[in-house]
Amino acid sequence: MPKRHAVVAGAGIGGLTAALALHRRGWQVTVCERAPELPATGAGIGLAPNALRALDAIGVDAARAAGSAIPITMGVRRPDGRWLTRTRTADMASRYGIAPIAVPRPAFTAALAAALPSGTLRYGTTVTAVDDAGGRRPIVRTSAGHDLPADLVVAADGIHSALRRAYFPAHHGLHYIGETAWRMLVDAPDLRLPAMSETWGRGCRFGVTPLSDGRYYLYATAVVPPGTRSADPRTELVHRFGSWHDPIPALLDHIRSLEPDDILQNDLYDLAAPLPVLHHGRIAWLGDAAHAMAPNLGQGGCQAIEDAVILAHLLPAGDAGHAGNGGDSTDPADDAAPANDADSTNAVAAALAAYTAARRDRTDAVRVRARRVGRLGALRNPLAAAARDLAVRATPGRLALRGMDDLFNGFRLPA
């Protein structure tokens, strides 16, 4: 039977999750990714209970697919090592039904990509424009010179989304949150660290996340003007954090063995204001393209996963609505003339309006909260930082965990 066709712009976590969720709803999917291949190196990602529930809804076991670690504790420390707050992941599992996990980002994206049919991903291909004038069925233009007719376009093209700029030209765009971030993976099986931690200094932070294979996902931030770069990030990290508590110096020793290109540095931006809607015609925005947020809650990828799963859930099944070639071809161009385009348009339009209603307020609340948490972590004034530390230490652990309920229990499939 002919299938509806979706074109996904971007093969990040949000785009690949959307592609897989749509595929399992019966859609034919084409993913256009500008990179020549999926990255083999990079950073890690924490998957919170809300993201794990969303993945479970489409039959993805992230822990099994990508290899995961469950830390014993999670919390925030001072540079001298004193814990400001700490939570056992067993308590989180008891409260939320599942413990958060940490996975290598390259392994996770590779697992999502491997679950898609052969030929779904088109590497080295950028979506350059979407021709949907007059409300007609979109034609996706690509850098490879191919025109892809689509019943749905998923704009998962990242924080600098070209499709967002094209369709929301009056939007304020991105907001620099005042920090740069370094991210890296280091191999240190000798350390055997049980805790996921973030250490707050004055205007700088250092995070440690154990992975399952003896590696650690490390990140660090510093308050600097945008565009600030050092000649060697390894030296910069040792200079900034070498005197902090154990095991940070030992981890920095492992960083010395990395190549400079193994350390990713990005200035941190979020969306200056929410988009008025998360859809236009038959285009839906998700992840950073829709609601770029600071990484301070570990929810950027998690919210992208929620977006993708809820979008696919709300859309009509993909195996209806076309006459075309009988569905045997794998080329979406062969399916360019659906028999009931009006019905297809109406069904998709209704689903996308429901998607905006389901996702816009939640994702913007997370974006705003992440910015506020980042401001706390980035305080440079000694008195303000000391007051912050006292306030965090004085907050009971149960109350702090309860404060995460809206995040970790917030995923729901709309009726």
Residue map of PLM features:
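Conserved N-terminal helical subregion
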Residues: 1-6, 23, 48-168, 172-185, ...
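Glycine-rich FAD pyrophosphate-binding loop
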Residues: 23-43
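Flavin-dependent oxidoreductases
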Residues: 177-209
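FAD/FMN-dependent oxidoreductases across multiple families
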Residues: 190, 202, 212, 222-299, ...
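C-terminal helical "tail/cap" subdomain of flavin- and related membrane-associated enzymes
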Residues: 2-4, 65, 81, 250, ...
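N-terminal Rossmann-fold NAD(P) dinucleotide-binding loop
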Residues: 15-16
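Conserved N-terminal Rossmann-fold NAD(P)-binding element of oxidoreductases
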Residues: 9-10
